[in-house]
């Protein structure tokens, strides 16, 4: 016995009876009926089951009894579904076996969710309501011309008259034969011979409907739908209505108490509503924001066998039967219909039967507007609100809308996709501190351009994708190292060799290293007293750490500083003293430094935790120093990869650009400092270079020769050694970076420090950290002039990019006072991982500011923000940046593979609080900062009030693509969860209420277009699906008028998109989105 294609299994007691065709059964059941698949989770409503019994027996539903200890709903597992049809009336019904469950697995949840996407209705069929002439004994059945041409086999019009035999089978597999002829005036398609026998046998009357269905084998099937007629009421002596009700309720209560299966029968033509609802559909309805006055649509079957949506308004929310079924969700919405002819529409409906209208404004505002949370990978668009938001918006649901009985890992009230996303995206807890992998000696090419992340092309820090609480525990560095090791499988052999050599020396070095580190840390703690005596050694910086921040950061700075060569220390001290010579506010933080010194004395135990890591690093450095020939052989044997060739092209491009550009003007006030800085630095670099060339890597010296950093970084080194090279590069170039690293807490300092330059994890281009914003603009500008003409292309690249950091500087003194006593600064976002602002250096007068300056975003107004500690002004308009061809998007697009085509899982969305303290405008790197109306509200007073500048807010991922349609709210979808274009069009049509109008792009009045990563406008469906998923940036649904306007204007951006409640920004153009009603957009988002 063959099972139906849709997975419905017949019951075993049917013997060899052939199962009913599922498509024909659903066609006879009606266009709104779709049974859930076997093995899925459903919600059974006993109250609705009793309504079906009452409707079939013509009884009133006002007196349906209840049963003790039977809840108003049961979550059950659907074990089997058997399709039936009455042999006399051909009325269809289904037999279902349900089993109440308290906990369930993920497969059942997925089956329930996938069941909503299955369309069980036939695709090729026609339905006609019979007329009086159709049911007469001599007339025949008149078939509509288009239906006959589509469903019936083609006629041979060479015959006179054209005619053929039609064979069709009904639900009981009975064969019926009709004569199909094309005749009459006017000519029409008729079924003549055999039709009158069919009508009399089935006892059809005018008003009944007949369906012809053609299956996938082109075989015809025949079914009927009977009109709803008054049937004679059964005598109470035959069967009792109350006994029927009590019987079905008792069976459900017994099954619920014992978790045993029970059987029900569902009659789709007699039941007023479905009382076995898929769990996914039920959850989806719960998380819709339903409130009084809300507009909605509801589907109804029409007289011509079609489907129509009726518009209505929610007028009340209450229990249908507050006495017997208190707190039940069955028909708990009172509704009113727009059309006066909708008198036969029900006055009460259930929440899962309606479709809320997607509009930005409501007739009566609901008590809660849903915020635009980031959409997790695999999450449907309408299932985003959490349990507390749902309770606030729907207080009538009480406390039992979730699964109180479910003793499973799925939290009460959470939807299917929310639970799945929590299982898949379980963040790293703050207490979990993973150990560094053993393969720390893996080699890494600094010029590896094979990454999809554009920020890695200039050695920018990778986006921080970990949770905010874990960024202080060094997991980001571990993840970054692991990614680099995975990207270079060719170096596995060399890694193993280095690991073996490292393990031989590790035990010998460990004890000696522990003693030296303790001695050096004690010496450095004593040396910090020099600062209080007013000497020039400002390099011993102390970080302003919050109490909940790990305190090993400053200790590791001390340790690294003690390992710097003397020449490097003197050079950095001289540079820092010259760059900060005019800063009189430096002495105001003496008390803070004393406090930090006391704090560091209590943290000496932190060094012991890092001994294992430090010993491995030192032994690795010695291995590298002892085996220079091996490194050279590896360099010679390695051939240039395509990524290296791309790097060379990029470097040549940079050289050409720098030759065309002139040196930025420098004010006369900075000329003495710049000249003295250049002379001192050149002298110190020569001493450092000569001393390092004479003395190779000494035991315990955690540094590299300075000559290494003046050469193109092509030596294969480990990630830690690369960080050390970058740090010494800062020393040599006179940079005064004190930015925190991945996994370290941000610190605020009073002066540039050499301590953080010696830190292992400091990146040379972490140039938007909080410390750098608080007082290093002068040194950055000076170093730009000194090294503008560096011969090294890579060094020019570092210098040129770092010199263009000029926006978003905050008042250092105010920031220091704000952060010193701020104890809850735990979820700060590393701004350098999210974006960087490039602006030309402009010199202007000093403007003192004593309050937090608002960030200078690229708005329409020409606003200037001045750094309070340096003679530099920073333009707020970013338009001047895009004119620089060096940082234009097309250059990187031509040079870098997959530019702008970064995986969607690394595009981060920043919260409004995080954006409000920094300035992000990067014309060369695509970046999506999230919902634009959050940026629109950047000038709110919330920046100054409540919670401070950095409220506790976790970093969130954005992996979804925006979809816009004029006159509707913008939506966001995850294109990766669709399997093809058909499913995408169907879902978009459902979202925007245009079902059936997007599926056929040739005949539809709507055109689905998208913008790719090159800002080209293309028609959806032309490219292969995989390529479309990788390059789509946004999608627009255009009407025919908008398509004509676009063809005339030649620009998709010229088409107005009014009342877009939430939309994202295009790649690169960070703040280019405007609202016609900003206040309405902001309030809708909040």
UniProtKB/Swiss-Prot annotation:
Biased composition regions of type Polar residues, renumbered to the chain: 454-485, 700-710, 747-771
State the InterPro entries in the record.
Answer: ARF_dom, ARF_plant, AUX/IAA_dom, B3_DNA-bd, DNA-bd_pseudobarrel_sf, PB1-like
Give the Low complexity compositional bias ranges: 486-504, 659-697, 711-724, 772-785
Q: Which residues bind DNA?
A: 126-228
Say where the protein is mainly found.
nucleus
Q: Which CDD domains match?
A: B3_DNA (cd10017)
Pfam families attached here? ARF_AD, AUX_IAA, B3
Do you know which Gene3D superfamilies this protein is assigned to?
2.30.30.1040, DNA-binding pseudobarrel domain, Phosphatidylinositol 3-kinase Catalytic Subunit, Chain A, domain 1
Coiled coil residues, start to end: none
Per the UniProt entry, what is one GO biological process? callus formation
Q: Where is each PB1 domain found?
A: 958-1051
Q: Where are the transmembrane segments?
A: none
What note about domains is in the entry?
A: Interactions between auxin response factors (ARFs) and Aux/IAA proteins occur through their C-terminal dimerization domains III and IV.
Quaternary structure, from the entry:
Homodimers and heterodimers. Interacts with the auxin-responsive protein IAA1. Binds to JMJ30. Binds to ATXR2 in the nucleus.
Function, as annotated, reads: Auxin response factors (ARFs) are transcriptional factors that bind specifically to the DNA sequence 5'-TGTCTC-3' found in the auxin-responsive promoter elements (AuxREs). Could act as transcriptional activator or repressor. Formation of heterodimers with Aux/IAA proteins may alter their ability to modulate early auxin response genes expression. Involved in ethylene responses. Regulates lateral root formation through direct regulation of LBD16 and/or LBD29. Functionally redundant with ARF7.
UniProt protein name:
Auxin response factor 19
Look up and give the organism this protein is from. Answer: Arabidopsis thaliana
